[in-house]
Amino acid sequence: MAEPGAGLWADRTFLREVQYQTDRNLAARQSIYAYQQPPVNLMSQVLDLAAPCGFEVVADIGCGNGLYLAELGRRRHAGPFLGVDMSPGMLRAARQRAGDTARRSPALLAADATALPLRNAATDLTLAMHMLYHVPEPGQAIAELRRVTRPGGRLIVGLNGTDHLQEMRDVITAALASIGRDRAPRERLTLDQGETLLRPVFASVTRHDFVSRLLLPGPEPVADYVRSLPETKGVATPESVIAAVTSRLPDRPGAAFEVTTHSGCLVCA
């Protein structure tokens, strides 16, 4: 296992056995988007762009707790759809979520994105949403995504811009520094970097950016977010980090902590 810090975001053992043993940490980070103004429904945006039709084969690589699989189910996608994740805990959460919404359950596989157990040209549409920054060798994963996506099919990769949650990261960085910790959270692989890696591999790469903001009304959602981060794992007193973070938030009555959100997707063909 890697040393604590930014490297934990791509440490397979840590991710599988600690960070994503269940979907609790991921769900905590997902929950802050309830405070997004104006709201961006990224799942709908991505699937509207992809427009899967009829009986296309869809694979969600790094499916996490199954948000996109569940959305496919809600849309009554008629073709086969598959979720792949290296974490059994994530797959359990994905199965439960999809089972709550879909008329049928997706197939689910435990596998690494750099060695997918799929034949060449197996999928019509491949999703890789907010997962490449968890891969130690993103170029190798991109080669696999290219391999399993049929000629004429589409790959959609989701990543974040360099300014995504910048205000939150600034506050967390200052709080960690105040207790002598150097574990500044950062985007390990950004939207710009992903685009640079994908363009030599695909004939066409179209970028879509979705910029908004969070208006966080108090310390609770910030505290939940901080608890979910790898950077706070192994800290003897994580609550001291949370206290240091929340002490830096606006303290005026009714004042919200405003945080930039900048997600995007790259549609590759």
Segments the model singles out, each with a brief description of its role:
Residues A2-F55, L67-Y68, I156-R181:
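Conserved class I S-adenosyl-L-methionine
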Residues P39, L189, T196-A269:
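Conserved Class I S-adenosyl-L-methionine
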Residues V57, G153-R154:
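Short glycine-centered segments of the SAM/dcSAM-binding site in methyltransferase folds
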Residues V57-A115:
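Class I SAM-dependent methyltransferase SAM/SAH-binding core
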Residues T114-L125:
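A short acidic, Gly/Pro-enriched loop at the edge of an enzyme's catalytic core
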Residues D124-E137:
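A short SAM/SAH-binding and catalytic strip from SAM-dependent methyltransferases
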Residues G139-P151:
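A short glycine-rich, Lys/Arg-flanked "PGG" loop and its adjoining helix->strand segment in the class I
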